[in-house]
From Swiss-Prot:
Accessory component of the multisubunit proton-transporting vacuolar (V)-ATPase protein pump. GO terms for cellular component: COPI-coated vesicle membrane; endomembrane system; endoplasmic reticulum; endoplasmic reticulum membrane; endoplasmic reticulum-Golgi intermediate compartment membrane; lysosome; vacuolar proton-transporting V-type ATPase complex. It comes from Rattus norvegicus (Rat). This is Vacuolar ATPase assembly protein VMA12. The gene is Vma12. It is found in: Cytoplasmic vesicle, COPI-coated vesicle membrane; Endoplasmic reticulum-Golgi intermediate compartment membrane; Endoplasmic reticulum membrane. The chain crosses the membrane at residues 146-166, 179-199. It comes from the Eukaryota. Keywords: Acetylation, Cytoplasmic vesicle, Endoplasmic reticulum, Membrane, Transmembrane, Transmembrane helix.
Length: 208
C-alpha cells in the first residue's frame, strides 16, 4: 500500500534557501524532517530509474496543515507538481515445495474421483451386454409390426370410404350425401380398427 510520495523538483526547489517555503516560516521540526526526507536517497537509488527523495504522507499532511493555518497563498497542489505516488515493489514469498506437491496430489485425486463418477454408469455387466442383440431384434420386430398395423388401418379406412361412396350412388343422387355417408362409415370402421390396434399394442408392451 502506498504511504509516500516521490518528490518532484518543484517541492525540492521550494525547500531550498530562498525558495517558496522559506517565507512560510515552517516549524523547525517540520523543516528538518522535510529536508531529511528530500536529501535522503532511498534504497536502490544508485540505479538511474530507482526511487529517491521519498516524502511520507504524514509530512505532506503536516505541511498542508501549516499552510492552512497561515492562510498561505501557496497551495499544496502547486508544490506537488511533478511528484508521484510511490508504490513499493511487492515481494512475493517463495512457495513451499511440500505444499505445492500436496496440492498437486490433491488435484490428481479429485480428477480421478470425478472420472470414476462420470464413467460409473458407462460400464455394463457381461449378461447385459450379451443380451443387447436379442433386445435389438425384439425392438425391430415390434417396430415392424407397428408399421404393418398402421398401414392396414389406413388401407381399411380408405377401402371403407371408397366402397361406401360407390355403393351409395344407388341410394343418394347428390354427391354431398354420398360423401357424408362414406365419411360416417369410414369413421366407424376407423374407430373399430383403432380400438383393436390399441388393444394389440397394449398386449405387446405388456410382454416387453
Amino acid at each position: 500500500m502506498a504511504s509516500s510520495l516521490l518528490a518532484g523538483e518543484r517541492l525540492v526547489r521550494a525547500l531550498d534557501p530562498g525558495g517558496e517555503l522559506e517565507r512560510e516560516q515552517l516549524p523547525r521540526k517540520l523543516r528538518a524532517q522535510l529536508e531529511a526526507a528530500l536529501g535522503k536517497k532511498h534504497a536502490g537509488s544508485d540505479n538511474a530509474t530507482g526511487p529517491r527523495r521519498l516524502v511520507s504522507f504524514r509530512l505532506i499532511r503536516d505541511l498542508h496543515q501549516h499552510l492552512r493555518e497561515r492562510n498561505s497563498m501557496l497551495y499544496l497542489h502547486e508544490l506537488l507538481e511533478g511528484s508521484e505516488i510511490y508504490f513499493p515493489e511487492i515481494v512475493k514469498p517463495p512457495r513451499n515445495p511440500e505444499l505445492v506437491a500436496r496440492l498437486e496430489k490433491i488435484k490428481i485425486q479429485l480428477a480421478n474421483e470425478e472420472y470414476k463418477r462420470i464413467t460409473r454408469n458407462v460400464t455394463c455387466q457381461d449378461a447385459q451386454c450379451g443380451g443387447t442383440l436379442s433386445d435389438l431384434g425384439k425392438q425391430v420386430r415390434s417396430v415392424k409390426a407397428l408399421v404393418i398395423t398402421i398401414f392396414n388401418f389406413i388401407v381399411t379406412v380408405a377401402a371403407a370410404f371408397v366402397c361406401t361412396y360407390l355403393g351409395s350412388q344407388y341410394i343418394f343422387t347428390e354427391m354431398a350425401s354420398r360423401v357424408l355417408a362414406a365419411l360416417i362409415v369410414a369413421s366407424v370402421v376407423g374407430l373399430a380398427e383403432l380400438y383393436v390396434m390399441v388393444r394389440a399394442m397394449e398386449g405387446e408392451l405388456g410382454e416387453l
